[in-house]
A protein has these predicted regions:
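Structural signature of extracellular appendage/secretion-system components
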Residues: 1-200
Length: 200
């Protein structure tokens, strides 16, 4: 709101000039001009908030796509690892496949907190949030990003049709959700309240 300060100061100075000399036409013209300038400043600032929101939505969509890709690859690797361990009768581990899977888990963990449970057959189960199953053996759930039913400008994270946004924690995806909910939304609301207060 630092860029709003000069416009607001100029507007209030012009208001004081009119209050001091209500009959002055030049003072009234200056006040109207400053009011228009202030309105433009509000619109510019609101436009910046919308640009940031659009970018956050794009970023979240990209992260959801990445998570889906990692989950599918992990499920496919689970199948190969179980088959290889079965063929080797447990005497030799498919280290290259295990390394690939670990690498995918590390990438996934940068985006969202994950819990991993190793199964006896060599496969792993991957859980996110408050215990939602993202990968179970050869099955990978699908994450999606959809408009909130309460606010179409808000994107929410769904897993197999269920909204899990408020159950996630950690990582870049959760960070984007928190930034939107705890920084962007309140700032834009404050701007709106300020504009409304000036109008009324």
């Amino acid at each position: 709101s630092r860029s709003m300060a000069p416009s607001m100061k100029a507007f209030f100075n012009a208001v004081h000039e009119v209050a001091d000399d209500p009959s002055s036409i030049p003072a009234r013209q200056v006040m109207l001009s400053e009011a228009e300038s202030l309105t433009q400043s509000f619109n510019t600032m609101n436009g910046r908030f919308e640009q940031i929101r659009d970018q956050v939505n794009v970023d979240m969509g990209g992260m959801v796509n990445d998570l889906n890709s990692y989950a599918k690859e992990i499920a496919q690797l689970n199948v190969k690892i179980v088959a290889d361990i079965g063929r080797a009768k447990g005497e030799q581990l498919p280290n290259q496949l295990l390394d690939q899977r670990d690498n995918l888990l590390n990438k996934m963990a940068k985006l969202i907190d994950v819990s991993v449970v190793e199964q006896k057959d060599g496969s792993i189960s991957v859980f996110i949030g408050k215990g939602q199953s993202l990968v179970l053996s050869d099955y990978a759930a699908t994450l999606s990003i959809k408009n909130s039913e309460y606010d179409p400008t808000h994107k929410e994270i769904f897993m197999d049709g269920q909204n899990i946004s408020n159950q996630l924690s950690g990582g870049s995806l959760y960070g984007s959700l928190r930034f939107r909910d705890e920084v962007l939304d309140p700032s834009q609301r404050q701007l709106g309240l300020l504009a409304t207060g000036l109008v009324t």
